[in-house]
Amino acid sequence: MEWEQIFHEIKEKYNFDKMDEILEKAYATQTVYPARENIYNAFKFTPFNDVKVVIIGQDPYHGPNQAHGLAFSVMDGTKLPPSLRNMYKELEDDLNIQRHTGELTGWAYEGVLLLNNVLTVVGGQAHSHKGIGWEQFTTEIVKAVSHYRENVVFILWGAPAQKLESLIDRSKHKVIKSVHPSPLSAYRGFFGSKPYSQTNEYLVAHNKTPIDWGREDIQ
């Protein structure tokens, strides 16, 4: 199975003409993140048959030199956003791994699908592309991974991500849930939740290579 087949199935089910129109106009007249060629990087860097973990984000960062198509990731050399800083703090506490770049391309190459629920945003306007059609697309992506793949770990941080839990077949996948790593909620159960070691324990138990959470590749 390839992402192209999945995309084809989704486009058979939904008409994205309206969304395509909105995006066409937005990219022509506004600053939109990520750059157009980076919108689908999550799928480019993590082929369908390599997906071992899915981490769901909300929408892309809306500042310059941040979003590049992977949830939570920022371009190398960019200051770490607060949620990502907390993710790294938990990684260090959990597995004693220190990372030196905010770019998560290495995770993507390891088999971690870093999927935002909405894949584009207008610069400086959080959630500006909510409701234009991306949610249908990402819902179908989660369903497809659940349906066609085996023993995938779905990491759902925060209420919006956890709304997708009902789409996941828990008889053949693992779901890890906690509050969001945002500074607003991290101390209410994200810190100490050990999502990285939990993920690797599950993968090893199902004869899969664990994720190298310290891997750093630059796009």
From Swiss-Prot:
MF terms in GO: uracil DNA N-glycosylase activity
InterPro entries hit by this protein: UDG_fam1, Ura-DNA_Glyclase_AS, Uracil-DNA_glycosylase-like, Uracil-DNA_glycosylase-like_sf
Protein known as: Uracil-DNA glycosylase
Pfam family, one: UDG
EC code(s) of this entry: 3.2.2.27
Keywords (A to Z) from UniProt: Cytoplasm, DNA damage, DNA repair, Hydrolase
Organism per entry: Macrococcus caseolyticus (strain JCSC5402)
Gene for this chain: ung
Domain of life: Bacteria
Function: Excises uracil residues from the DNA which can arise as a result of misincorporation of dUMP residues by DNA polymerase or due to deamination of cytosine.
Family that this chain belongs to: Belongs to the uracil-DNA glycosylase (UDG) superfamily. UNG family.
NCBIfam families reported in the protein's UniProt record: PRK05254.1-1 (NF003588), PRK05254.1-2 (NF003589), PRK05254.1-5 (NF003592), ung (TIGR00628)
An individual GO BP term: base-excision repair, AP site formation via deaminated base removal
Active site residues of this protein: D59 (proton acceptor)
